[in-house]
Amino acid sequence: MNPPTVTVHDSTLRDGQHAVRHQLDADQIRAYAVAADTAGVPVLEVGHGNGIGASSRQVGLSKTDDATMLTTAREAMPHSRLATLMLPGWATSTDLRSAIRHGVDIVRVAAHCTEADVTERHLGVIRDLGAEAQGVLLMSHLAAPDELAAQCQRMVGYGAQAVCIFDSAGTYLPEDVTARITAITTAVDVPVAFHGHNNLGMAVANSLAAVRAGARVLDACARGFGAGAGNTQLEVLVAVLERYGHPTGIDLRLVAQAADLAERTLMPAPPTIDSTSLVSGLAGVFSGFKKPVLAAAQRAGVSPWDVFVELGRRRVLAGQEDLIPDAINTLTSMGERP
């Protein structure tokens, strides 16, 4: 039996934005989109790190507006499909209509792992507008496999044509992925995707576990570009999939060159697993908290490690960075210091 084909979903120009405070410009987007398209990357996701409509003081003002980002990428890619992400509460139906008008083929609607209900209206709008609608569950480690499967069933019922779970905190080991993807693929009859982060150095291994459990779409970023320890590394994932015989349609040499370009032009340095990224994975806290935690901990004279442990105890979610000062207050009241 031949290994199944795997669709690689390149999130470099969306999830990578977290690493540069959403400051990618049109020239950077254009150059990478051309390289990805040339390499045969089937899907390229573009946007503010938190999705369309999310540019704000709370989660970061984008250097480039949504319309410019999407139009620039669309014009640079005659072959690859263009995807974007939206979070209900940030993006509106108006944002969706604008994104699809600017050439988006796939819209992912993301929600906390136990709150699939909030995706219903948006998934329906996307289908009505003629784009492919996908449902995403964030912070998926906070839900048991059967709960994730039930939430994915709801999204499929709302119109999702694929479902994806994010290891938002980079906390999974392969057996965690196997249990969750197996439960989901058993419960739904649409493609299942996995989005890994590399806090524990397991992103590629976890992605392989996902495929073996039935996932057919894997997310990745060039050089792992992303917050903290970064995402599944695109060019490494393609190479490993190739070694295992999984067709991807991607030219390995050209995607490696695209990753070289990304390192030179998109990021100050490739992501690494430092102690802060490690503890955020262990604590189950989204990697986007890294920079604000480091800054706040330094000002307060407390250990970033302890801040992450406290945030993990509180089960914080992306967008709740305003809880960092309160976590630090708790630590200082307990007499915690570096």
From Swiss-Prot:
Active site: H18
GO biological process, one term: catabolic process
CDD domains according to UniProt: DRE_TIM_HOA (cd07943)
Pyruvate carboxyltransferase domain sequence ranges: 6-256
Pfam family, one: DmpG_comm
Reaction(s) catalysed by this chain's protein: (S)-4-hydroxy-2-oxopentanoate = acetaldehyde + pyruvate
Enzyme category, top tier: lyase
GO MF term set: 2-isopropylmalate synthase activity; 4-hydroxy-2-oxovalerate aldolase activity; manganese ion binding
Keywords: Aromatic hydrocarbons catabolism, Lyase, Manganese, Metal-binding, Plasmid
Residues of the site described as Transition state stabilizer: R14
Chain residues that bind Mn(2+): D15, H195, H197
Binding site for substrate: R14, D15, S168, H195
Chain coiled-coil ranges: none
UniProt xrefs under InterPro entries: 2-IPM_HCS-like, 4OH_2_O-val_aldolase, Aldolase_TIM, DmpG_comm, DRE_TIM_HOA, PYR_CT
EC number, UniProt record: 4.1.3.39
Family: Belongs to the 4-hydroxy-2-oxovalerate aldolase family.
Matching NCBIfam families: 4OH_2_O_val_ald, PRK08195.1
Protein name: 4-hydroxy-2-oxovalerate aldolase
